């Protein structure tokens, strides 16, 4: 397990507990009470740290290398029924954007999401979860296919942003994202969006328009990353903590501002500490959202979605 800087007290206590247990196993010394005290201190420390996370610390947790990515979520949600689909039928298949059909229980869904890599080689293969225009066009192709066959859509969002390279701009990155936003706003099937990691800027918005937008507890959603914001305002990444607070990018901030509809709770310490529980909770929230939407007529579904987004950004003096 890799520990973040603010988790070091937990790491130290775990090491102490391991040493205590080894001493008890390898000698005749009774260390039961000592181990019990360390365990209690460990639990108290975890509650204190994870119960008082700053915005920047939640950003760090959203990027934890052990945190489950999109494919892992889909695999656990669909229990072996996932059939991946490829290509945008215009340019090529973008490995940073994945999608396909799968079932949760007896209900079919079209899944779409950004995929990061689990190691250096895979991160390069997946372009670090930064889709090109063909990725967003593939996502739209699959969503339009879902509309044709009346299949609800689930998007899993985890990206540091759309790929900013010149070749992406030449192929119409801005147009691809804008087109997705337009088409998702009027898609005639339920759309459930789940932010499972990073939700950065237009890269997230390109698959982020839905009837229900859910955020996992330790994720973020913003027009810009804290580091980039800091580099623009202060010409340095040193102020990323202040930028994270100012951006109001946490799940609690987004719920308060009515940008997202619900927060999916995570196990203590983050989704990577207990993946099975995290997967189960995500499944429950997806099905809950779908059950709220499935009986709506197409007209009411689209009208409610448009009304929801029309109300965002209201300002009262």
From Swiss-Prot:
EC number: 2.1.3.15
Pfam families noted in UniProt: ACCA (PF03255)
Reaction equation(s) it catalyzes: N(6)-carboxybiotinyl-L-lysyl-[protein] + acetyl-CoA = N(6)-biotinyl-L-lysyl-[protein] + malonyl-CoA
GO cellular component: acetyl-CoA carboxylase complex
Subcellular localization, as worded in the UniProt entry: Cytoplasm
Main subcellular location of this protein, as a coarse class: cytoplasm
Domain CoA carboxyltransferase C-terminal: 37-292
Domain of life: Bacteria
One MF annotation (Gene Ontology) recorded for this entry: acetyl-CoA carboxylase activity
GO BP, sorted A to Z: fatty acid biosynthetic process; malonyl-CoA biosynthetic process
Subunit details: Acetyl-CoA carboxylase is a heterohexamer composed of biotin carboxyl carrier protein (AccB), biotin carboxylase (AccC) and two subunits each of ACCase subunit alpha (AccA) and ACCase subunit beta (AccD).
The family this protein is said to belong to: Belongs to the AccA family.
Chain's role: Component of the acetyl coenzyme A carboxylase (ACC) complex. First, biotin carboxylase catalyzes the carboxylation of biotin on its carrier protein (BCCP) and then the CO(2) group is transferred by the carboxyltransferase to acetyl-CoA to form malonyl-CoA.
NCBIfam families assigned: accA, AccA_sub, PRK05724.1
Protein name: Acetyl-coenzyme A carboxylase carboxyl transferase subunit alpha
Gene: accA
